[in-house]
Amino acid sequence: MSEAKGVGGIDPRATPGSAGAGERPPMGTVSRAGDGELYAPMPSKHMVINLGPSHPAMHGVTRAVVELNGEIIEEMKLDIGFLHRGFEKSCENVTWGQVFPYTDRLNYVSSIMNNVGFALAVEKLAKLEIPERARYLRVITSEIHRICDHLTLVGAMAMELGAMTVFLYGIEARDLLWDRLAELCGARLTSNYARIGGVARDMPEGWQEKTLKVLDRVVAIREEIGQLLNRNRIFIDRCLNTGKVSREDALELGFTGPCLRASGEPYDIRKAAPYLVYDRLDFDIPVGSNGDNFDRYLMRMEEMRQSDKIIRQCFEQMAPGEIIVQDFRYALPPKPLVYGTIEGVMAHFKLVMEGIKVPAGEVYSYTEAANGELGFYVVSDGGGRPYKLGLRAPGWPMLAALPVMTKGSLLSDLIPTFDSINMIGGEVEQ
């Protein structure tokens, strides 16, 4: 490895004019450039810097205290909690149906996956079977949000390495998909689309055709992004062999999702423990070999192709039918029944005021979210509110491993490594 150089190419381990080669100068020593010198010598080889939380590369929610030897990271400590809202406790103070808006604020880039994960946990506890059409709609919207999440990561990662064009292309594609989701569920970001027993709304007329047309455009944009980055010398040099994690280390550190698969472990919950209709769909699980930042980028690119494939199959297989269970102990009755019958009024009143009565018990349910395994541990005492709710955030193990992934690497390697794990503050800090 070449020797690390400080600012201006000066070797911080032997700076002229310091208190001695490699020694820390006395407190208060001022270093000034001499006549004819462009840079002042660095006063010490050791430096501790604060990166974030206001630094744009830290996405506003994470502080990293980094100890450097020249430009080499010797140690890093993470300071989190800037986005903590008390998610779990908040959910224990509302009815089961009122939890969904809180889940929207976990991974806010792919919120429908959070909705679906919580709904599946409650349905598993209540032993509730949902209609087939609702299953397909959940998969379609989840995979659309998976593409949006990966587009955001690829665009932000490229932008923070200097490729602004890629970011703009990614945001264009993401906005096209978000517009379709807004037409379906009324919101681009915080969707609140899933319901216990089904989904909130069916597809509006012409929505399938418009979505397929948008997917064609997204495919073209994604291919153009690949052409810009896959053989880009600068992007490859910044990402290849940086932030490496072996398969064994990834498993020991608790990695799941694209970061685990990039390290060579072919584990995907959609295949390992299929839910909804994933067992009826034909799609592949991409697996990396190097476990570095470039593999994690390639993993997202290939997963977008597989999500596109899944969505198109769902449109082909989905048949007309109900979108939510017709059991008014769990689902609100339709408005004609509420306005026209006393039974409908009573069912509506009890669900809104008291909440769904979920049978007493506890369950852990897990799904394959954009960043890995999203798990909900739910405890019910038979009342209308969760007695206890615990969340397994997929991004936390990767964030906790960041000091291990970056130790001994250059400070500049921290940026693509942080981007490639896709730490979302909403889900990690809850």
UniProtKB/Swiss-Prot annotation:
InterPro entries: NADH_Q_OxRdtase_suD, NDH1_su_D/H, NiFe-Hase_large. The keyword NAD applies. Transmembrane segments: none annotated. Its EC number is 7.1.1.-. It is a peripheral membrane protein. HAMAP family: NDH1_NuoD (MF_01358). This is NADH-quinone oxidoreductase subunit D 1. It is an enzyme of class 7 (translocase). Belongs to the complex I 49 kDa subunit family. Residues 1-36 are annotated as: Disordered. Keywords: Cell inner membrane, Cell membrane, Membrane, NAD, Quinone, Translocase, Transport, Ubiquinone. NDH-1 shuttles electrons from NADH, via FMN and iron-sulfur (Fe-S) centers, to quinones in the respiratory chain. The immediate electron acceptor for the enzyme in this species is believed to be ubiquinone. Couples the redox reaction to proton translocation (for every two electrons transferred, four hydrogen ions are translocated across the cytoplasmic membrane), and thus conserves the redox energy in a proton gradient. It comes from the Bacteria. One of its GO terms (molecular function) is NAD binding. Pfam families: Complex1_49kDa. NDH-1 is composed of 14 different subunits. Subunits NuoB, C, D, E, F, and G constitute the peripheral sector of the complex. One of its GO terms (cellular component) is plasma membrane.
